[in-house]
A protein has these predicted regions:
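Short loop/beta submotifs within extracellular cysteine-rich repeat domains
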Residues: 5, 14, 38-41, 59-60, ...
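The canonical Cys-X-X-Cys-His
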Residues: 2-10, 49, 84, 139-142, ...
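Inter-heme linker and motif-flanking segments adjacent to c-type heme-binding CXXCH motifs
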Residues: 59-62, 90-99, 130-136, 157-162
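Small beta-barrel nucleic-acid-binding modules, principally OB-folds
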Residues: 89-126
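Gly/Gly-Pro-rich "capping" loops immediately C-terminal to redox-active cysteine motifs
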Residues: 10-46, 64-78, 103-112, 156-172
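Stable alpha-helical elements in mature extracytoplasmic
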Residues: 2, 45, 49, 64, ...
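Electrostatic cytochrome c docking/interface patches
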Residues: 1, 115-144
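C-terminal capping alpha-helices of c-type cytochrome domains
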Residues: 45-59, 72-98
Length: 172
């Protein structure tokens, strides 16, 4: 779990990316999230990092593909997003160039992601349920935001969005 499971290729440097993520739309390759200023996220500001995590937008303004779980990370607090950045920036840098995705047309166009977001992205921090206990709300926050459990354990629709009617129903 956590960042390392997607952002570390087999036999690769930790957090240096390159792990293939096969989808019906093609293969995505995880990026380098080490603090390397040239090939990783070392040049990112707090605003850049929070916008990537919570809005699915790169520092250059391009939209991320939803293979990156920003659709779930949007539910985390701004403070937790910056705590993750602080941790990642404390790790060793790896000068590993990011590999281009191998995604079929028209899904390869990042601009298409803007339309996808209009249909399937509900931005915003998870609000606690006042009818539930503090412990329950903390668990919900861990499952629905930080641990992003639904990203692997919820089936997706034909457009690659989580099928919320099947929340945590499994994908195998």
């Amino acid at each position: 779990g956590g960042c390392v499971s997607c952002h570390t290729a087999k036999d690769g440097e930790t957090f240096a990316g390159g792990r293939p993520i096969k989808t019906p739309f093609g293969t995505f390759y995880s990026p380098n999230i080490t603090p390397d200023r040239e090939t990783g996220i070392g040049g990112w500001s707090d605003k850049d990092f929070a916008k990537a995590m919570r809005e699915g937008v790169r520092p250059d303004g391009a939209h991320y593909f939803p293979a990156f779980p920003y659709t779930t990370y949007t539910r985390m607090s701004h403070a937790d997003a910056l705590a993750i950045k602080s941790y990642l920036f404390s790790l060793p840098s790896a000068a590993q160039v990011n590999r281009d995705h191998d995604v079929r047309f028209p899904f390869s166009w990042r601009v298409v992601q803007a339309g996808w977001k209009l249909l399937f992205f509900d931005a915003g921090e998870l609000a606690p349920d006042p009818a539930k206990s503090e412990e329950w709300n903390r668990g919900a926050y861990l499952v629905e935001a930080l641990a992003h459990c639904g990203e692997c354990h919820t089936p997706r629709n034909s457009f690659g969005a989580l099928d919320r009617t099947m929340w945590l129903a499994g994908t195998i």
